From Swiss-Prot:
GO biological process, one term: translation
PANTHER family listed in its UniProt record: 39S RIBOSOMAL PROTEIN L28, MITOCHONDRIAL (PTHR13528), LARGE RIBOSOMAL SUBUNIT PROTEIN BL28M (PTHR13528:SF2)
Keyword set, alphabetical order: Ribonucleoprotein, Ribosomal protein
Keyword Ribonucleoprotein among UniProt keywords: yes
Domain of life of the organism encoding this protein: Bacteria
Entry GO terms, CC: cytosolic large ribosomal subunit
Organism: Histophilus somni (strain 2336) (Haemophilus somnus)
Family in the record: Belongs to the bacterial ribosomal protein bL28 family.
InterPro entries: Ribosomal_bL28, Ribosomal_bL28/bL31-like_sf, Ribosomal_bL28_bact-type, Ribosomal_bL28_sf
GO molecular function: structural constituent of ribosome
Name of the protein in question: Large ribosomal subunit protein bL28
Matches recorded under Pfam families: Ribosomal_L28
Lineage, opening ranks: Bacteria, Pseudomonadati, Pseudomonadota, Gammaproteobacteria, Pasteurellales
Length: 78
C-alpha cells in the first residue's frame, strides 16, 4: 500500500539527517497517515480512507460527501 493521502495527495518527501558535525545522510519524511472509517449517510455505508491528519481536518470542514466527490472526480475508486 502506497504512503499517499487520498484527500491531500501528500506523499513521502526526501531530505537529509544532519548530525552535530553537519554530516548529511539521506532520509525520508513520511506523511502522518492513518486508516480511518467514515460513515457516509447518503450511501448508508462505511468508507475506509487512508489519509493524513490534515486530510481529516479537511473532511471535518467540507464534509465527507464533498470530499468523496472530489476523490471520485480524480478517478480513484472508493
Amino acid at each position: 500500500m502506497s504512503r499517499v493521502c487520498q484527500v491531500t495527495g501528500k506523499r513521502p518527501a526526501v531530505g537529509n539527517n544532519r548530525s552535530h558535525a553537519m554530516n548529511a545522510t539521506r532520509r525520508r519524511f513520511l506523511p502522518n497517515l492513518h486508516t480511518h472509517r467514515f460513515w457516509v449517510e447518503s450511501e448508508k455505508r462505511f468508507v475506509t480512507l487512508r489519509l493524513t491528519a490534515k486530510g481529516m481536518r479537511i473532511i471535518d470542514k467540507k464534509g465527507i460527501d464533498a470530499v468523496l466527490a472530489e476523490i471520485r472526480a480524480r478517478g480513484e475508486k472508493i
